[in-house]
C-alpha cells in the first residue's frame, strides 16, 4: 500500500461503509487478480492522471466495459489502435449551485493556499489562482475532480439522498 495515500484511502473506505455504498475494498487479498477480473461486470478507473494506464488495456483483455475518465494523453493511442473506450467521460460536471460558488471558491482556494504555503509562495501566485478559480466557476459547472475531498463527499451524500440531483449529474 502507498503510505502517502493510506490516510485518504481509510477515510474514503469509512465514508463508503457509513453510507452503505455498494463498494468493495481489498478484494485483492481474497482473490487472485484474474478471479477479480472474471467476476467483474465492469472495470472502473477513478484516475484523473496516469502513467501508463494498464486498466484501459486490462478491460479489453477480459472483455469488460471500462467506466471512468477519458485521459486523452493515455487513451488516444489506445483508441487509434481500435480499443473501444466509448464508455469513458471527459469530465464529471457538477452544477456549482449544488454547493454554492462561494463555498466552492473558499474550499478550493484555502486548500491551494495551504498547499503552496509549504512552498515559497507569493501574492502574485495567489492572485493568479484567484482569477483562474473565478474563471472556472463562472461557467456554472465544475469538474468533480477539481473539488476538495470534503466537497466531493458532500456531492456524494447529496446524490445518495436526492435521486433528482443524481439524475441531473448523469445528464
Spans of model-derived segments:
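Short histidine/acidic/glycine/proline-rich micro-motifs that form metal-
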Residues: 1-3
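Short acidic alpha-helix that forms the nucleotide-activated donor recognition element
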Residues: 29-40, 61
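A short hydrophobic beta-strand element within the catalytic core of glycosyltransferases
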Residues: 43-44
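Catalytic binding pocket for nucleotide-activated donors in carbohydrate/polymer assembly enzymes
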Residues: 52, 57-171
Amino acid at each position: 500500500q502507498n503510505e502517502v495515500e493510506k490516510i485518504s484511502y481509510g477515510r474514503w473506505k469509512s465514508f463508503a461503509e457509513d453510507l452503505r455504498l455498494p463498494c468493495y475494498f481489498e478484494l485483492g487479498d481474497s482473490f487472485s487478480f484474474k478471479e477479480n477480473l472474471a467476476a467483474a461486470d465492469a472495470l472502473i478507473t477513478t484516475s484523473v492522471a496516469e502513467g501508463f494506464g494498464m486498466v484501459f488495456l486490462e478491460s479489453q483483455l477480459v472483455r469488460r466495459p471500462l467506466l471512468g475518465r477519458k485521459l486523452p494523453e493515455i487513451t488516444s493511442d489506445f483508441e487509434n489502435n481500435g480499443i473501444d473506450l466509448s464508455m469513458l467521460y471527459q469530465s464529471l460536471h457538477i452544477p456549482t449551485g449544488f454547493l454554492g460558488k462561494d463555498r466552492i471558491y473558499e474550499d478550493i482556494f484555502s486548500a491551494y493556499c495551504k498547499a503552496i504555503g509549504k512552498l515559497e509562495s507569493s501574492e502574485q501566485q495567489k492572485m493568479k489562482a484567484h482569477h483562474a478559480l473565478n474563471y472556472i466557476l463562472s461557467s456554472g459547472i465544475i469538474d468533480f475532480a477539481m473539488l476538495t475531498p470534503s466537497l466531493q463527499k458532500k456531492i456524494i451524500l447529496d446524490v445518495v439522498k436526492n435521486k433528482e440531483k443524481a439524475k441531473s449529474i448523469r445528464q
